[in-house]
């Protein structure tokens, strides 16, 4: 009887989690995922496919709230179960790699990240997923890694590949908008200011029309707009958009989030520049 009750609770939590995802409420989503992980292991077993999936999803989401150690341990646990049961050439193993690489990217532990991304791409290719959303995701995320390490032209090549795939998958319009937003900085850095403005404007409109102005993805686009204004020397406008982005980011991810801390640093930098210009 208790097992049936737990299954009912799992169903309720999955529904609740999906609502929080749609609303961009990551702090609330993490709480739900943690309870889901406990119940899923209890109901289906530690080595079940259900448990593998929830561990992977929990680990991938924890990076946004700054719970890096737990994120790494959770994903590695899922990877080990998959490897033991199925080997390394299946899609869930690749997705674990992708999530682990993203956690390391948020932690700025860059030494093994590229290897993880490339292994992920290879596994997706072996499984004929070159035109799938999953392949678009790894292209986009590897592009972000190249941005973090100053390889902006390489980043653009990968973001463009991601867009090419997502254009044919209309159900992923939010992910399409996110990829556009991710292209703002590399276009700026490679001297293509008009393209940078074009993708920023398009991404903002798509995100606003899809999930509204309170979503974490809208926060990311506001951050990109602030970066544009900062690079143009319009520090008051940059401050306005950094602060608006930080407000949404804090609600979505909490004060321990790396994104939120980065925004606070940017706000201080802009205030310092404004002080010098007065």
Question: Where in this protein do the model-derived segments appear?
Answer:
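TPR/TPR-like (Sel1-like) alpha-helical repeat modules
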Residues: 235-254, 268-271
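Short coil/turn linkers that connect adjacent helices within long alpha-helical scaffolds
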Residues: 2-4, 42-46, 84-88, 126-130, ...
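TPR-adjacent "capping" and linker segments in tetratricopeptide-repeat scaffold/adaptor proteins
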Residues: 1-12
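Conserved alpha-helical positions within TPR/SEL1-like repeat arrays
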Residues: 11-22, 49-64, 91-106, 133-148, ...
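Amphipathic alpha-helical segments of tetratricopeptide repeats
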Residues: 37-42, 79-84, 119-126, 163-168, ...
């Amino acid at each position: 009887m208790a097992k049936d009750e737990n299954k009912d609770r799992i169903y309720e939590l999955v529904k609740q989690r999906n609502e929080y995802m749609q609303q961009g409420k990551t702090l609330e989503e993490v709480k739900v995922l943690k309870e889901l992980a406990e119940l899923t292991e209890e109901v289906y077993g530690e080595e079940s496919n259900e448990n593998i999936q929830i561990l992977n999803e929990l680990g991938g989401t924890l990076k946004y709230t700054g719970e890096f150690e737990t994120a790494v341990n959770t994903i590695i646990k899922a990877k080990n179960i998959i490897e033991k049961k199925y080997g390394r050439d299946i899609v869930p193993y690749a997705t674990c790699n992708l999530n682990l690489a993203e956690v390391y990217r948020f932690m700025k532990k860059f030494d093994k990240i590229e290897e993880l991304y490339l292994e992920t791409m290879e596994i997706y290719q072996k499984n004929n997923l070159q035109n799938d959303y999953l392949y678009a995701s790894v292209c986009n995320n590897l592009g972000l890694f190249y941005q973090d390490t100053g390889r902006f032209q390489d980043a653009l090549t990968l973001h463009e590949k991601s867009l090419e795939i997502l254009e044919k998958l209309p159900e992923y319009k939010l992910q399409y908008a996110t990829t556009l937003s991710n292209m703002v900085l590399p276009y700026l850095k490679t001297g293509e200011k008009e393209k940078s403005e074009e993708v920023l404007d398009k991404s903002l409109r798509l995100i606003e029309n899809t999930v509204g102005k309170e979503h974490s993805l809208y926060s990311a686009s506001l951050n990109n707009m602030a970066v544009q204004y900062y690079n143009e020397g319009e520090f008051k406008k940059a401050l306005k958009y950094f602060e608006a982005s930080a407000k949404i980011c804090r609600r979505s991810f909490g004060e321990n989030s790396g994104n939120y801390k980065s925004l606070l640093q940017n706000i201080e930098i802009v205030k310092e520049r404004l002080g010098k210009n007065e």
